[in-house]
A protein has these predicted regions:
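Extended, solvent-exposed, turn-rich assembly/linker loops in the middle of proteins
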Residues: 130-207
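Ser/Thr- (and often Asn-) enriched beta-sheet segments in non-cytosolic proteins
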Residues: 41-43, 74-76, 83, 145-147, ...
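Pocket-edge structural micro-motifs
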Residues: 46-48, 177, 293
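Hydrophobic/aromatic-lined pockets within catalytic cores
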Residues: 12, 16-20, 110, 114-126, ...
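Long, contiguous amphipathic alpha-helices that act as assembly "spine/axial" helices in icosahedral shell
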Residues: 71-137, 175, 251, 279, ...
Length: 351
């Protein structure tokens, strides 16, 4: 069973969840239009940020226009395709059944597709992380990434909220993170209600999405993207025959949803007859003229992040943070603050 188990694809799950959310940036009309758009350029009308609005201190009979400037955002598509074949006669007198082999092939190919789509979602977050921080609190940033020293690892989850709020994103926050952040949250959970210090507020108001495709740079142990709710989405489109659900010359096209991937993808099925004697070695040596089934799945994907016409001056809803690694075999210490240090001599209580 462990040869086909999936990992967590938190970035992909996050984009899909946000696409289906009530406050999604993707309208049902855009979703339907995109699905059948292959062969066309899809553009989304948007309105640019206007920093030139003037507030007057006098009344006047002449009211300024304050017109908006519109633009068109062209969707960028990436194609993903997977597939496998089956030779039905090969399962006669075989310990592995047709259904067993089919399910394993379906699982491994869709797992590979889910992993590729998850990597694409992480890349979209990376490309759209904010370049603007109204405040960094007590942190530094390098390359638009917040650098969290080891001593402040227990504070960054809580500090993400005021950093986001200062950037005018008070919405609740999603964290797309890796195992290092999971480890940190579990340590904070040991200091919950009725314990020495209640650290639940650091992480309680976050929605957590884990993926191994958020990777740590050297000397880091924990990387995450914090994203304000309602600011990302994902669009798919299928080939024309899949949308038409064509049946012709023993070929069949359709639109389906695969395991692990709650997105519409195009499917293509057909059969052919040929020499299948080499497909499974001696077990199929006699299949010099046999039927082979072909199962193919493909989809075009566009990752969307809320439009920003002035990324160098207007904050994006995505913050990336990296936590510095501790030395090996060194535990994470919780900070201890001495509030009455002035009552003790310089050398300590026993000096």
């Amino acid at each position: 069973r462990n040869m086909f188990r999936p990992c967590e694809y938190g970035a992909l799950d996050f984009f899909i969840e946000q696409t289906n959310a009530p406050n999604s940036i993707i309208s049902p009309n855009l979703r339907d239009r995109a699905l059948v758009s292959i062969g066309n350029t899809v553009q989304v009308p948007v309105i640019n940020y206007d920093e030139n609005v003037q507030v007057s201190n006098v009344r006047s009979c002449v009211i300024a226009d304050n017109e908006n400037t519109s633009a068109l955002v062209t969707l960028v598509w990436a194609t993903y395709a997977i597939g496998f074949t089956m030779v039905p006669a090969a399962y006669s007198n075989n310990e592995i059944s047709y259904q067993h082999d089919f399910m394993r092939k379906m699982e491994k190919t869709t797992r590979a597709l889910a992993d590729a789509l998850d990597k694409g979602a992480v890349a979209a977050l990376e490309a759209n992380k904010t370049q603007v921080f109204k405040t960094l609190l007590n942190y530094k940033e390098t390359g638009n990434v917040i650098q969290v020293p080891t001593q402040m690892a227990t504070e960054i989850l809580g500090d993400i909220n005021p950093i986001m709020r200062a950037n005018c994103y008070p919405e609740y926050i999603h964290l797309i993170a890796n195992a290092g952040v999971d480890s940190l949250i579990r340590k904070l959970a040991q200091h919950g209600v009725y314990n020495d210090v209640n650290k639940r507020m650091e992480y309680d108001n976050k929605v957590l999405h884990y993926t191994n495709n958020v990777t740590d740079e050297e000397s880091k142990m924990g990387t995450m993207f914090a994203v304000a709710d309602g600011n990302v989405g994902i669009l798919t489109r299928v080939d024309r025959e899949a949308y038409r659900r064509t049946r012709a010359n023993f070929h069949e096209w359709d639109i389906v949803r695969l395991p692990y991937i709650d997105l519409p993808v195009g499917s293509h099925y057909y059969t052919a007859v040929g020499d299948q004697s080499a497909i499974m070695g001696d077990a199929t040596a006699d299949l010099t003229c046999a039927v082979k089934e072909y199962f193919g799945f493909s989809v075009d994907v566009a990752y969307m992040v809320a439009y920003n016409s002035k990324q160098e001056t207007v904050a994006n809803p995505i913050i990336k943070a990296e936590i510095a690694a501790r030395n090996q075999n060194e535990p994470l210490g919780m900070p201890v603050y001495v509030t009455n240090a002035g009552e003790f001599p310089a050398g300590g209580a026993g000096a």
